[in-house]
From Swiss-Prot:
Disulphide bridges, residue numbers: 64-70
Its job: Has antimicrobial activity against Gram-negative bacterium E.coli ATCC 8739 (MIC=100 ug), against Gram positive bacteria S.aureus ATCC 6538 (MIC=25 ug), methicillin-resistant S.aureus ATCC 43300 (MIC=100 ug), B.subtilis ATCC 6633 (MIC=12.5 ug) and against fungus C.albicans ATCC 90028 (MIC=100 ug).
This protein's name: Palustrin-2ISa
One GO BP: defense response to Gram-positive bacterium
Localization of this protein: Secreted
Stretches of the chain forming a coiled coil according to its record: none
Family named by the database record: Belongs to the frog skin active peptide (FSAP) family. Brevinin subfamily.
Domain of life of the organism encoding this protein: Eukaryota
UniProt keywords, alphabetically: Amphibian defense peptide, Antibiotic, Antimicrobial, Cleavage on pair of basic residues, Disulfide bond, Fungicide, Secreted, Signal
Tissue expression notes: Expressed by the skin glands.
Length: 70
């Protein structure tokens, strides 16, 4: 009976460790996805800001040519 308890306790302990390692691995994979989404979002914001600045510059040059006041 004592040997059976020891082996069951050992199996429970090993199963708990295995489950813990799986959860850590899963959370590490999830963090990678979040970082990737943040990078994509950051790239899109940068591209939007560059396009906005180019448009403003072009409009200023066009206004300058039309009015002739530069």
């Amino acid at each position: 009976m004592f040997t059976l308890k020891k082996s069951l306790l050992l199996l429970f302990f090993l199963g708990t460790i295995s489950l813990s390692l799986c959860e850590q691995e899963r959370s590490a994979e999830d963090e990678g996805e979040v970082i990737e989404e943040e990078v994509k979002r950051g790239f899109m914001d940068t591209a939007k800001n560059v396009a906005k600045n180019v448009a403003v510059t072009l409009l200023d040059k066009l206004k300058c040519k039309i009015t002739g006041g530069c």
